[in-house]
C-alpha cells in the first residue's frame, strides 16, 4: 500500500492500524530551532481522543504521544527542547483494542465501509476495526498538525461543527468560546443543547448521523499557493477529502456561490493599510487564483453518517453468499464530532507546506 505520505516540503507519513500495536507519523521537513514539547502535541490529541463523552465511541485510548526523534535539548538550548531539522517520529500506542468484536465480519463486507474495496484491491484486509481505513489513523494526523502549527507564525486555526444531520447552527449566535464548552465543538451553545437530545435519540435507535465541519485559518499571509496545479485551495480540498468519511469539500461560499449574481459574489476592495487592498467581503474564502489573499481561509466539508450501526443491513461474503449484518463493537454515532481537531490539523499541515514553498519562490524574498 503506497500513498501514505502527503506534502512537498513539509511532509507527513502516517503509519499503523486500528488494532495494531501502535500508530504514528514521521514529519519530514520541519525547520530546525522550533520549540517542541510532547505536552503541546498531547494537548491537541486530547481534544480528539475517544471515550470523552457518551456521544463518541467508548473505546478508551489515552493516546499518549512519544517523540522518538527530531528534537534535542541541552545547556546550549537553554534547556528547551528544539527541533533539529531531522525527521520527527511520533508514536501513539493502542491499548484498548477488542478485536473479538469483529470476528463475525471477517469474511463479510460491511456496507458503507472500505471492506470490499480493500479486499478487491489488495487481496487481504485487516478486518479488526477497519485496520488502516479506520478513523483511528487520524490521531497521527493530529500529532503532525501540532508540529505544523509551529511552522506558521501568527496563524490561528480553529474549527467547529456547524451542522449535524439536517440541523444547522444559527450563525448569528456563533461564539468561538462556546466550541470548547460542549462535547460537539459547536459554536452555537443553544444548538449544542439540542444536539444532545438529538444524538441521544439516534444512539437509542442504534443509528448514526453525518455532520458539516467548518475550519477557519486567520492571519494567513497573502501569497501562499501557486497557479494551476499548486493551488492552495486544491491542496486543502485534497487534504480534507483524505479524512475518513468525508464526502464533499467547499472553499468560502462554495456551492452557494453558484446561486449568486456576479456583483454579489465579487470580493470588492478599497484602499487599506500599508498600501495593500482591504477586501469588503470574503466569498472566496481567502483564496483567489489558488493563492491566499490575506483574508481568513475558510473550508467546509461534509462527513457521512458512521457506517457501523446496529440496524441490520444486507450484504455479501467474500464467497458471494448473501447475509444480513449487524455491526458490533464501539463506534461513534456521529464521527463528524471528532473530525473537528483533525480538520485543524490538516489545515495546519497544508499551510505549513505552502509557507515553506512560498519562502523559496517569492518576489523580493518576502
Swiss-Prot record:
GO terms for cellular component: cytosol. Pathway: Metabolic intermediate biosynthesis; chorismate biosynthesis; chorismate from D-erythrose 4-phosphate and phosphoenolpyruvate: step 7/7. Disulfide bonds: none annotated. InterPro entries: Chorismate_synth (IPR000453), Chorismate_synth_AroC_sf (IPR035904), Chorismate_synthase_CS (IPR020541). One of its GO terms (biological process) is aromatic amino acid family biosynthetic process. FMN binds at residues 132-134, 244-245, 289, 304-308, 330. GO terms for molecular function: chorismate synthase activity; FMN binding. It comes from the Bacteria. Keywords: Amino-acid biosynthesis, Aromatic amino acid biosynthesis, FAD, Flavoprotein, FMN, Lyase, NADP. The keyword Nucleotide-binding does not apply. Its cofactor is FMNH2. Reduced FMN (FMNH(2)). Its EC number is 4.2.3.5. It catalyses: 5-O-(1-carboxyvinyl)-3-phosphoshikimate = chorismate + phosphate. NADP(+) binds at residues 48, 54. This reaction introduces a second double bond into the aromatic ring system. Homotetramer. Belongs to the chorismate synthase family. HAMAP family: Chorismate_synth. This is Chorismate synthase. It comes from Methylobacterium radiotolerans (strain ATCC 27329 / DSM 1819 / JCM 2831 / NBRC 15690 / NCIMB 10815 / 0-1). The gene is aroC.
